[in-house]
Amino acid sequence: PNSRFAPAFGDRTGFGERSDTIMMWRVNPATSQVAVLSFPRDLYVKIAGRSAKRRINEAYERDQPQRLIDTIRNEFGIETDHFIQIDFCAFKTLVDAVDGVAVPFALPVRDVNTGLDVPEAGCYTFTGDHALAYVRSRKMQVFEDGRWSSNTGDDRARISRQQDFIRRTADSLLAAGAFNPSVVRALIETSDDFIVNDAELTLNKMLEFAGVLRNVDPAAITTYQIEASAERVQGSD
């Protein structure tokens, strides 16, 4: 609460009520190929077990992913083998474990809502809290021609930033040897209080996935977004 990035965390008393970021990962152990599909959090869909269409992030209930899993299967025909919820604290731990993640910027950027502040163009290294402020930013502004302007895109631009940050984090993890089984085990144990996963996604299974990721070129991770168009629904964009 004393961090200048506290707004990026939102109201922690309500954490888990809605998902902030939804991604489907496909990891192929045989080919070491990884694909990531992101869903806009404000995408309107028919929520499983409910009559009206709502934002997809409302399908998630605190530590209970089944409704979200069912919604994705019903709406997109995608089956889910495993589920993992990573909260803000686990995200921060991961970024700090590799001494931060560097991201290049052509111009200064900020988001007064999350506390994001990159004061000058160039390569900026984000540590835990500030990294969260960056990936959660929805009202990012750039400083150009002597003034701040909001022209950094919509939720799709936010998804692109998140996917790019994943690649850069993977690069940092590989460089730090963080996919080594002993390091992965330590990271998982350190973040255990901040991670929720299905019963079949055991520690050994996580280590198996880490072994696959160790052989993946982050630049070769394929990323996709669910196509959607902007529309005002019930007074909201």
Give residue spans per PLM region:
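Extracytoplasmic
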Residues: 17-22, 31-39, 51-53, 67, ...
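Flexible, polar/acidic helix-loop-strand segments at domain edges
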Residues: 94-182
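Entry/capping segment at the start of metal-dependent catalytic domains
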Residues: 1-32
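Amphipathic, coiled-coil-like alpha-helical scaffolding segments used for oligomerization/assembly
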Residues: 57-121, 200-206, 210, 216
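Soluble non-cytosolic domains of exported or imported proteins
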Residues: 15-19, 50, 58-67, 85-89, ...
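Second-shell loop/turn segments in exported
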Residues: 9-13, 53-62, 77-82, 121, ...
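Sec-exported extracytoplasmic/periplasmic mature domains
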Residues: 26-29, 44, 48, 61, ...
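C-terminal solvent-exposed extensions
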Residues: 3-5, 52, 126, 190, ...
